[in-house]
Amino acid sequence: DVRDFALWKAPRDNEPCWDTPYGPGRPGWHIECSAMIRKIFGSTIDIHTGGVDLIFPHHENEIAQSEAAYGERFVRHWIHVEHLLVDGAKMSKSAGNFYTLRDLLSKGYSPRSIRYLLMSAHYRKQLNFTLEGIRQADQALERIDNMIVRLKDVRNESGNSTELHDLTAGMKARFVEAVDNDLNISAGL
């Protein structure tokens, strides 16, 4: 049926291909991922991630072929992230509105600030990635670093007080609670 997805594709110029009893070819897009997962992790994995644009057809086809082939559940938990916006528009290599990590690092932005910005929105929400956002992430990290220094100073001055212990234990508990709620790192921060 023409609507079926391809498990094996005919060879194309300048693409790798393999000889098989059915003729030369290459794995279809969906089977590539299933085969790599099977080889490295086995027939069932705990977490599989990807963009929301991959739910259909890619992830549904991965499920169909893997569960049909092995008779076992393919993935226990899916994490589908929303699209990343750059300066208010969907990031697209073809539109030229994207940054590479190398570009950002060469402009002096720290990996830590970039990571913080990317974690500042829940994975199910779109994030508008801007250079101003990285600067704001720098400021947020500076506040966190200053708080840690102050907490260490208080601990050194007063010893391991019950009040300080309760404060930091409460902060940790709220962070863990947020992360336990659909991996909501942004709420934890």
What are these regions (language model features)?
Residues 127, 133-189:
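Helix-loop elements that line ligand-binding/catalytic pockets
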Residues 1-154:
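Alpha-helical recognition segments enriched in aromatics with Gly/Pro capping
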